[in-house]
Amino acid sequence: MARKHPKRSDPRILVLDIGGTHVKLLVTGLKQAIKIPSGPALTPKAMVQQVNQALTDRPYVVVSIGYPGPVVHGHPVREPFNLGSGWVGFNFRKAFSRPVKIVNDAAMQALGGYERGKLLFLGLGTGLGSAMIVDGILEPMELAHLPYKNGKTYEDYIGLRGLERLGRRKWEREVGKVVAQLRAALEPEQVVLGGGNAKKLKKLPPGTMRGNNQNAFKGGFRLWSEDKRESQRFRY
């Protein structure tokens, strides 16, 4: 089982899970995550300011960020669809005055819930996050904006826009169809459905399990693990 919190020897870690409606943050030792609003006007500079205001009495020494978009070599390479601009090229290390590790948000959730084998993670939130871990190698994916049907993307059907347009029942059927399609193509041993809208599924598609949203924080802690056995399990 993955441990819930870093060991005492680990640094005090701040984990940020950036979503389309909220940024959720947790510092080593805190039992409850803090939420700050996000949305189309949120810039990285504003986020850093709000995070530090929320943590005036909670010191931290390193930062993990789950970013809602593609990340290459620890840097965002595309502006997020559901937030403000300025994320690509932003110097997070300088802004926080601390070491920072950035991964895709779905990848961070997948990392937090992974045990072994081949896992596919789909994050059903404002958008659609996706990641795979194959024998400890983390592979973020960008399935959201691939064509699905009727001139629309996967995200148009099973992201928040799809839920609002189709209604819960039809949306749930589309989730099942997408999962079946991806299972056939990628042959994962496990399929985990996470994100804020996963809880709206009345019946899970066959062969899937509902993820725990706390896995994002576990994944963020794992990025800085000082346990060599833990840190050597993953490549990202």
Predicted regions: what is each one?
Residues L143-A180, E187, M209-G219, W224-Q232, ...:
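Helical "lid/coupling" subdomains associated with nucleotide-phosphate turnover
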Residues V23, F90, K94-Q109, K118, ...:
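Glycine-rich phosphate-binding loop plus the immediately following alpha-helix
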Residues Y67, L124-T126, G195-G196:
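Short secondary-structure boundary segments
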Residues G39-N52, T56-S64, G69-K118, Y157-I158, ...:
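Glycine-rich phosphate-binding loop and adjoining helix at the ATP-binding site
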Residues A2-Q49, Q53, D57, I137-R165:
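Short glycine-rich, Thr/Ser-proximal phosphate-binding strand/loop in the N-terminal lobe
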Residues I13-D17, V62-S64, L119-G123, V192:
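Short glycine-aspartate micro-motif
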Residues H22, L182-N213:
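Glycine-rich phosphate-binding loops at beta-strand->alpha-helix junctions
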